[in-house]
Amino acid sequence: HLTTPAVRMLLMTSSESVIDVLRSAYLEELETVMNYRTNSIVLEGVRAQEIKESLEADIAEELGHAGELGQRLKQLDANPPGSAAFTAQQESLQPPADSTDVLAVIDGVLDAEDGAISTYQQLVELARAADDPVTEDLAVEILADEEAHRSEFRGLRKEYSGD
């Protein structure tokens, strides 16, 4: 189809924004994996087991998301970032000083999921604006996973805060 130079420029700018957010999301997923792994190791106590198991299960899914995002970047003729591009962001997901503080970890997970949901909502909009239905579909798929994780941990939050 025919596009004007202004429309082509807008689509190019939109495509660059899509790539920027894909790269950011890729790094966020890997940071989440690091923090989930650390918390699944550090947490202890009778109450911690369910949370540790949930974090362990989510690690594989988050790694899968990173893989999908990296592949999409490659398809767009861009590369996923290396570790030199990484700046830690997830302060609330750092291991708690008290290794039995299950609620601190749950709250950190909820913060991380809220951040991921925001990122994927932004990616959906940018991909739509860039006329990139493949990235839009990927973002919607991952968004659904992140919303499911948030729902799971909201339930755990209710359960553990009621003790």
What are these regions (language model features)?
Residues 1-163:
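Iron-associated oxidoreductase/ferritin-like identity signal
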